[in-house]
Design a protein with these regions (language model features):
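Non-globular targeting/processing and membrane-anchoring segments
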Residues: 1-36, 43, 47-64, 74, ...
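A short, hydrophobic beta-strand/beta-hairpin element that forms part of a small beta-sheet core
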Residues: 91-107
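Residue-level detector of anion-binding/catalytic polar loops
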Residues: 67
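Structured beta-strand/turn binding interfaces of compact recognition modules in eukaryotic regulators
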Residues: 41-43, 76, 98
Length: 122
């Protein structure tokens, strides 16, 4: 009869393939963040946000008239987890401007109200 230690070892033995796949997602995130002036990781799409926080960020960005790219984390569970690890930020949405994490809905809304966000996206 296998011990728990052995069972866990067997269950986790798919690690290298998963690690390679995770590395691919991290590379895709890195490429997207560096390659887009304004990038939004969100639940849903700008046309159909799937949470109130994502909708709030879309409203702010659209209100500024700034072009931005978005990624729907609901379409890709691996992306949804990887973006949180990439940024060390636990929630979605996440807004990146000029390759740097700005924050989520509360921070973006507050920066917009103070006029700071418009200066960053120009």
């Amino acid at each position: 009869m296998p011990s728990f230690k052995n069972i866990f070892k067997v269950v986790g033995q798919d690690g290298p393939a998963h690690a390679a796949q995770s590395g691919d997602v991290m590379e895709r995130i890195r490429h997207d963040v560096q390659g887009n002036k304004v990038l939004l990781y969100m639940k849903g799409t700008p046309e159909f946000p799937q949470c109130g926080f994502s909708a709030a960020v879309v409203e702010v960005l659209n209100g500024l008239g700034v072009p931005y790219e978005s990624r729907n984390v609901l379409e890709d569970p691996e992306l949804r987890q990887a973006i949180k690890e990439f940024s060390n930020w636990p929630t979605i949405p996440q807004v990146y401007i000029n390759g740097k994490l700005i924050g989520g809905a509360d921070i973006v809304t507050e920066m917009n109200q103070r006029g700071e966000l418009a200066a960053l996206v120009k």
